[in-house]
Amino acid sequence: MKHNSVVVVSGGSGGIGKAIITRYLQKGFSVISIDLIDTFDVKNSNFFFLKGNVESEKSIRSLIKLIIKKHGRIDYFFSNAGILNVGDHNSSNSDWKKNFNVHLMSHVYISKILIPIFKKQKQGYFLITASAAGLLTHIDSLTYSVTKHATIAFAEWIAINNYNSNFQISVICPQAVRTNMTKGREKDVAALDGMLEPEVVVDKIEEAIYEKKFLILP
């Protein structure tokens, strides 16, 4: 990664997103966090918070345009927002809609404006956070499992159909990670062999970026 890279992270208020932001601020990059709340108590001229809702295409489009206007480009975009609802086939329609909006449509909205930018720049890296549940399953959450499978399918299609483009795409599929989302779930089946620390996940992400791996398996 270049020393003056512009990095954007959605879902940056905690967990993996916050660890990504912290890591790249330490490297001196310009980092923009997109989320509903700002949890960073830092005074760093390279950090910028933009309030936005990843479920809204209008919000995403306006924020990315704002970033381009201010910074001139985007080098790395981490599409990282996520939620977790416990439930089976009886999960409410609103839970299903929320999970699909956050875990699938947010990436769709971002890709619509980001990919043309990357093609114009002739470079860029689109990193999408999915989950090991998207490769296997999450015993306690049907909505999470199904929509994370959709996340991976989306990333695969984008990668295959842009194979000869000048930008890269990766999908991140970690096992259980110690975040606010998994707090109190240390005894869940997914965490029986322990939870990963967010910083460890970022280590694996950096290795994969260097090697240009599509599937990142922390």
Which residues fall in each region the model found?
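Conserved glycine-rich cofactor-binding loop
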Residues: 13-14
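The beta1-alpha1 cofactor-binding region of Rossmann-like NAD(H)/NADP(H)-dependent oxidoreductases
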Residues: 51-62, 93
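C-terminal helical subdomain
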Residues: 171, 187-218
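Conserved mid-core segment of classical short-chain dehydrogenase/reductases
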Residues: 83-97, 140-143
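Active-site helix of classical SDR
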Residues: 111, 147
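Active-site-adjacent segment of SDR/Rossmann-fold oxidoreductases
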Residues: 136, 157-167
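Residue(s) in the substrate-gating loop at a strand-loop-helix junction
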Residues: 131
